[in-house]
From Swiss-Prot:
Coiled coil: 970-994, 1086-1112
Source organism per UniProt: Homo sapiens (Human)
GO-annotated biological processes: nucleosome assembly; nucleosome disassembly; positive regulation of DNA-templated transcription; transcription initiation-coupled chromatin remodeling
Expression tissues: Highly expressed in estrogen receptor positive breast tumors and in osteosarcoma tumors.
Keyword match ATP-binding: yes
Upper classification of the organism: Eukaryota, Metazoa, Chordata, Craniata, Vertebrata
Alphabetized UniProt keyword annotations: Activator, ATP-binding, Bromodomain, Coiled coil, Hydrolase, Isopeptide bond, Nucleotide-binding, Nucleus, Phosphoprotein, Transcription, Transcription regulation, Ubl conjugation
Ranges for domain Bromo: 980-1092
EC number from the UniProt entry: 3.6.1.-
This protein's name: ATPase family AAA domain-containing protein 2
Residue stretches of biased makeup (Low complexity): 42-57
Subcellular localization: Nucleus
Modified residues (Phosphothreonine): 1149, 1152, 1176, 1323
Length: 1390
């Protein structure tokens, strides 16, 4: 500190009033440390009375002394003009450091310091290494001044005593003001520079973290302390000395600012009170040291960087939200190992995260980087918290999920890929061609590399899957990944979703792509599968964001750039082929493109077989074929969903009780049978994925109109095969196809025709002559033997209005040709989209049909279509049709309600009658109409009402609650491996507990608890404390594997504390000290465990303990043998030596340790326990004497056995040779007592059984009723028959039903009264006049002779409504009358 001084004249008491104005400003001018000012004020208060007495006694002596000191001061001023500065600064620093240890200043301490200040200045001259040359000059000036003054010391004062006294007053006063400003500015610069230096050192040492401070040796710790103290002496930021080696370092880093501020505030208050006392002591100080200006400062000594110690692996449990220090300038320090602190010290840790350190010397770029890292960590923590499950708390997550949450498991490069290993190629149906092509790309290069080496070719390295959703694109990728994981040559499989590689950071997406391909190249052969690749590589355009363009460019370069990607197969999947950048769709990148279309009939059947192959019993092939035929437009995912929904329908139908309870009930799985009705319900609920957005025009004939129009559909298909031979190729494909080897279907590739050789050495002379005569090797023209051919295929279905050509026939034909791609060009398609013109829509549809040939263009109601559209669209349509190549397999299918001759000429030119392109629909004949109405009138009208008794019986069935599932029995190898893992966990627990106990034992405060209490010193300790415990006994129990959880350990720590509090009263100071230390021991142990123990580890130990208890595994199995050594027997005779093998076995087993603090227990007489204690109190009953005697004998036997058990257990505890823990002994004793209590209870059950004889008889009806309900096939007549025959037991049945009433009503399915009413109703007989129904059928067929399809459907609906109204009638007479009346009154005018 720089201290400004007044003139060197002596204090003149008479001039005190004249210096009032300057005295008031002394606080501002004085920059001296407050501790020094307090010391001088204390000295002034002590010497003031003496000075006053001397002054009053002899005034001349005062003048002489004043003259003497003025002379000496002037001489010193002229001699040391070059060294005038603050000579008292170093002395103030030394005194401040010496007084900092005390923290509390008193008058007595101030006097003692004032008396010894000369010796302290001469002996304790500390010159910091970081002081400048100016500080050394100060010390030299101080020594020279002491030599000149002799034993008269120049006292310093921070005040200007007199305004007019002194030598050359104007010069001194001017220099005073100048030096004041310079000194203040200089001191401010020094303090800022010191703070910056210290911040840099803390940043360099910031890597020291928590446990490293405790691991430093004495030399390193002292060296760091000297370096830090050097900076502290030159600044005013440290006042306290280090009390201990560990606590001092934490104080220097954490408590500097707070202690300094508090102490400065206190000293400022004391300074105002001691102003008057300082006047008498500070009057002798001179002011010649303020005459010299401040010159250039010296640079500080360079502090070289010291490499930090390597961070130890063991550290305290990681925090979820803060993985490291919040700021590099404020590192975190943990509790020291020797003296653990209170958990209240965490307050500074919490505040530290809110403090942002700033370093003015660091560059702006480093600050920005640190600020960015902090913001990124905070944003990641918030994102992680948002991703947590809503019904899970942070402490409920398992350790592995916590670890993934800490490292940011949502990143693409660290997220593991989980695959279903059960999906193989045999789990994929209807895609055999795609699977064979994938084998060529991946499997064959590994199995047959010599083939590719011979021709120096590379197999295709990329393929693109495209098609509608749910057609098996991702499924094939999963199957490929699992197939590549089998065998010796495994293929690495990388899977990335569409947006996994996208990131908001510039360049991060490209970096992840490069890392992905680099990793795949290092692990080659490998496969990279991009699911939904349209989100990663969309079409590049000028209006698109530049980021996506950069990603697409990077992907293009990685797939086929200057550097070959080697054995890396890239597979992409999308359902939007037009959204992918066209540069990807070329050989070298995506060599092959596989269309995953909707499965046909055979593919659907194969998919159904795959999903039902594990059912028991398996469904019939005929049923699966019929089901596949009705699942038109269903993709593979839809079929899988139908199978699952059918199984749920069967479960709902068989056991409706499970939907009303949350408990698991016992079910008979063999009684759950899936029927065709379940599939019907599932198909009614299920809407195919392809029909949710756009409805497909193809639709099979419904079961109602199928007898009426099936023949017509067959005729249309025959006519279509003549015009469009590809239809026969598709429909009859299943007749001669080989599904196991689909590649053999190509007749051209596998034909037996002799073809000329293309090799040089394979040509014969004839062939060479032919080659010279321009012989053609390639026949690229169409061959009629290998491919069907058609010329502009077109067909028009013509009929009268109402014949069903547009509503039934054309959709049925399209359904039969379901393998072809169908494009609808009707009026809603043309005018439904407002963004495009009809002409543009028409052109796009026809171009797509041409591109995907063979295909179908469907134009329904072409007579209306041609009248509505304009001439531009007509010209566009006809032009595009003419531009299609002549032999292109693009079929034009149209329907019309007008005859061909009534159509416009342009339409008539499109469809030529002579080519068979026109099909006229005829009315149904008599046979077709008879089949149409036969099922409705003869079968459905005569069907009896549906009986609900079977459903009621199933609803009344009360299912018992299922017991919890038993765990799978482990094999011997699995048990051994499990025990090894558990022992590894317990080994870590024991190491941790030993460390905690060692830290408690080496603490001097807890030394009294390290050893057991000596019974010789305190004989009454045994009588007061029943269970002594100390830290040495705790260590012994740790060695013997007695602690399976930390709770057991803390229980013994609590026992040590409770024993100390119980034995030591709160009266004597020594006893109170022990009580305080016992409480401190307990709190310290809890604090250490709370700070360093992971809660997941404690939960794991508890689970292992519970598992071992259930398995009956002893914890002492792995305890060390021979832990207790027998004492040496020097005088033992040979005959006294034991040779019993049983004794040797006892010595090998680990015995229970006897705690050192546990004294030898005195043998007492075991008091007989009462019956209440044993839990065998008998109920007083009036029974026979024989039973009473036998019961008494059993009671005596139980009591005697219990006493023997207690005696043996006491002997065990006294000898200390038991091989199991005390917990296990208690469990064994409890089990023994429980077994005897069971014997007693069994003897009492005979009376209870006698009392329940009557109730057993009354349950016979209930058992019979339950058996009927469980069968489910028993008819209601059987139940009524039982109740009629057993009239005497009718009350029994009703009474048992009332007993089950609460259970049935809890299911909330049906009320008991309603169920009993349904079951008690008799089943009336069915009355049907079949002759009248046959006559009605003939009448209907005759009347509907000239009806078209719509009129026949209308009549069918009228008859169906009559049947529905009378569905509950058993007498069908009224139904027949109503149907006859409706048929007679039916009119076809509509």
């Amino acid at each position: 500190m720089v201290v400004l001084r007044s003139s060197l004249e002596l204090h003149n008491h008479s001039a005190a009033s004249a210096t009032g104005s300057l005295d008031l400003s002394s606080d501002f001018l004085s920059l001296e440390h407050i501790g020094r000012r307090r010391l001088r004020s204390a000295g002034a208060a002590q010497k003031k009375p003496a000075a006053t007495t001397a002054k009053a006694g002899d005034g001349s002596s005062v003048k002489e002394v004043e003259t003497y000191h003025r002379t000496r001061a002037l001489r010193s001023l002229r001699k040391d003009a070059q060294n005038s500065s603050d000579s008292s600064f170093e002395k103030n620093v030394e005194i401040t450091e010496q007084l900092a240890n005390g923290r509390h200043f008193t008058r007595q301490l101030a006097r003692q310091q004032a008396d010894k200040k000369k010796e302290e200045h001469r002996e304790d001259k500390v010159i910091p290494v970081t002081r400048s040359l100016r500080a050394r000059n100060i010390v030299q000036s101080t020594e020279h001044l002491h030599e000149d003054n002799g034993d008269v010391e120049v006292r310093r004062s921070c005040r200007i005593r007199s305004r007019y006294s002194g030598v050359n007053q104007s010069m001194l006063f001017d220099k005073l003001i100048t030096n004041t400003a310079e000194a203040v500015l200089q001191k401010m610069d020094d303090m800022k520079k010191m703070r910056r230096q210290r911040m840099r050192e803390l940043e360099d040492l910031g890597v020291f973290n928590e446990t490293e401070e405790s691991n430093l040796n004495m030399y390193t710790r002292g060296k760091q302390k000297d370096i830090q103290r050097t900076d502290e002496e030159t600044t005013d930021n440290q006042e306290g000395s280090v009390e201990s080696s560990e606590e001092g370092e934490d104080q220097e880093h954490e408590d500097d600012g707070e202690d300094e501020d508090d102490e400065d505030d206190d000293d400022d208050d004391d300074d105002d009170d001691d102003d008057d006392d300082e006047d008498d002591e500070d009057e002798e100080d001179g002011e010649e040291e303020n005459q010299k200006r401040y010159y250039l400062r010296q640079r500080k000594a360079t502090v070289y960087y010291q490499a930090p110690l390597e961070k130890p692996r063991h550290q305290r449990k990681p925090n979820i939200f803060y993985s490291g220090p919040a700021s590099p300038a404020r590192p975190r320090y943990r509790l020291s190992s020797a003296g653990p602190r209170s958990p209240y010290c965490k307050r500074m840790n919490r505040r530290r995260h809110a403090i942002h350190s700033s370093d003015s010397t660091s560059s702006s770029s480093s600050e920005d980087e640190q600020h960015f890292e902090r913001r990124r960590k905070r944003s990641r923590n918030r994102a992680i918290n948002r991703c947590l499950p809503l019904n899970f708390r942070k402490d409920e997550l398992k350790g592995i999920y916590k670890d993934r949450m800490k490292i940011g498991a949502s990143l693409a490069d660290v997220d593991p890929m989980q695959l279903d290993s059960s999906v193989r190629f045999d789990s994929v149906g209807g895609l055999s061609n795609h699977i064979a092509a994938l084998k060529e790309m991946v499997v064959f290069p590994l199995l047959y590399p010599e083939v590719f080496e011979k021709f120096k070719i590379q197999p295709p390295r990329g393929c693109l899957f495209y098609g509608p959703p749910g057609t098996g694109k991702t499924l094939v990728a999963r199957a490929l990944a699992n197939e590549c994981s089998q065998g010796d040559k495994r293929v690495a499989f990388f899977m990335r979703k569409g947006a996994d590689c996208l990131s908001k950071w510039v360049g991060e997406s490209e970096r992840q792509l490069r890392l992905l391909f680099d990793q795949a190249y290092q692990m080659r052969p490998s496969i990279i599968f991009f699911d939904e690749i349209d989100g990663l590589a969309p079409v590049r355009s000028s209006r698109q964001d530049q980021i996506h363009s950069s990603i697409v460019s990077t992907l293009l370069a990685l797939m086929d750039g200057l550097d070959s990607r080697g054995e890396i197969v890239v597979i992409g999947a999308t359902n939007r082929l037009d959204s992918i950048d066209p540069a990807l769709r070329r050989p070298g990148r995506f060599d092959r493109e596989f269309l995953f279309s909707l499965p046909d009939k055979e593919a659907r059947k194969e998919i159904l077989k795959i999903h039902t192959r594990d059912w028991n019993p398996k469904p019939l092939d005929t049923f699966l074929e019929e089901l596949a035929e009705n699942c038109v437009g269903y993709c593979g995912a839809d079929i899988k969903s139908i199978c699952a929904e059918a199984a749920l329908c069967a479960l709902r139908r068989r056991y409706p009780q499970i939907y009303t309870t949350s408990e698991k009930l016992q079910l008979d799985l063999s009684s759950i049978n899936i029927s065709a009705k379940d599939f019907e319900v599932a198909m009614q609920k299920m809407i195919p994925a392809s029909q949710r957005a756009v409805t497909s025009p193809g639709q099979a004939l419904s079961t109602v109109v199928k007898p009426l129009l099936q023949n017509t559909v067959d005729k249309i298909l025959e006519a279509l095969q003549r015009v469009f031979p590809h239809a026969e190729f598709r429909t009859n494909k299943t007749l001669d196809s080989d599904i196991s080897c689909p590649l053999l279907e190509s007749d051209l590739a596998y034909s037996d025709d002799d073809v000329p050789s293309v090799y040089e050495n394979g040509l014969s002379q004839k062939s060479s002559h032919k080659a010279k005569d321009n012989f053609n090797f390639l026949h690229l023209n169409r061959n009629a033997c290998y491919q069907p051919m058609s010329f502009r295929p077109r067909i028009l279905i013509v009929g009268e209005p109402g014949f069903g050509q547009g509503s039934h026939l054309a959709p049925a034909v399209i359904h039969a040709l379901e393998k072809f791609t169908v494009y609808t060009l009707d009026i809603p398609v043309l005018f439904g989209v407002s963004t495009t013109s009809p002409e543009e829509t028409c052109a796009q549809v026809i171009r797509e049909a041409k591109r995907t040939a063979p295909s179908i263009v469907y134009v329904p109601h072409i007579h209306v279509w041609w009248e509505i559209v304009g001439p531009t669209l007509k010209a566009t349509f006809t032009t595009l049709l003419q531009n299609i190549p002549s032999f292109a397999p693009v079929l034009l299918l149209a329907t019309s309600d007008k005859p061909h001759s009534a159509l416009p000429e342009e339409v008539q030119e499109l469809f030529i009658r002579d080519y068979g392109e026109i099909f006229n629909v005829q009315l149904p004949d008599k046979e077709e109409r008879t089949k149409f109405f036969e099922d409705l009138i003869l079968k459905q009208a005569a069907k009896p009402p549906i009986s609900k008794k079977k459903a009621v019986l199933q609803a009344l069935e009360v299912l018992p609650v299922a017991p919890p599932p038993e765990p799978r029995s482990l094999t011997a190898e699995e048990v051994k491996r499990l025990e090894e893992q558990e022992e590894d966990t317990f080994r870590e627990l024991r190491i941790f507990l030993r460390n905690v106990t060692h830290r408690l034992a080496i603490d001097k405060r807890f030394r009294v608890f390290t050893k057991p209490v000596d019974p010789d010193e305190v004989p009454d300790y045994v009588t007061v404390i029943k269970q002594p415990m100390d830290l040495s006994s705790v260590i012994s129990k740790i060695d013997l594997h007695k602690y399976l959880t930390v709770k057991d350990y803390l229980r013994d720590i609590d026992l040590i504390c409770s024993n100390a509090l119980e034995y030591n009263p709160d009266r004597d100071p020594g006893d109170r000290l022990i009580r305080h230390r016992a409480c401190a021991l307990r709190d310290t142990a809890y604090a250490i465990i709370k700070e360093e123990l992971d809660e997941d580890f404690e939960q794991l130990c508890e689970e292992i303990q519970e598992s071992r208890k259930k398995r009956g595994c002893s914890s002492s199995k792995y305890a060390p043998s021979y832990y207790h050594v027998m004492p040496k027997q020097n005088s033992t005779l040979v005959g006294d030596k034991r040779s019993d093998p049983e004794q040797n076995e006892k010595l090998k087993t680990p015995s229970t340790p006897v705690a050192c603090s546990t004294p030898a227990q005195l043998k007492r007489k075991i008091r007989k326990k009462s019956n209440w204690y044993l839990g065998t109190i008998k109920k007083r009953r009036k029974i026979s004497q024989a039973k009473d005697d036998s019961q008494n004998a059993i009671d005596h036997k139980i009591e005697s056995d219990t006493e023997e058990t207690q005696d043996t257990s006491v002997d065990h505890n006294e000898t200390g040779n038991t091989g199991e823990s005390s917990v296990e002994e208690n469990e064994k004793q409890q089990n023994a007592s429980e077994s005897k209590l069971e014997l007693r209870n069994n003897s009492n059950t005979c009376n209870i059984e006698n009392e329940l004889e009557d109730s057993r008889k009354t349950t016979a009806c209930t058992e019979l009723r339950d058996k009927i309900a469980c069968n489910g096939d028993a008819s209601s007549s059987q139940i009524i028959h039982i109740s009629d025959e057993n009239e005497g037991k009718e009350m029994c049945v009703l009474r048992m039903t009332r007993a089950r009433r609460s259970q049935v009503e809890q299911q909330q399915l049906i009320t008991v009264e309603k169920a009993l009413a349904i079951l008690s109703q008799p089943t009336p007989s069915l009355v049907v006049d079949h002759e009248r129904l046959k006559n009605l059928l003939k009448t209907v067929v005759k009347k509907s002779q000239n009806y078209n399809i719509f009129q026949l459907e209308n009549l069918y609906a009228v008859i169906s409504q009559c049947i529905y109204r009378h569905r509950k009638d058993h007498d069908k007479t009224s139904l027949i009358q109503k149907m006859e009346q409706e048929v007679e009154n039916f009119s076809c005018s509509r």
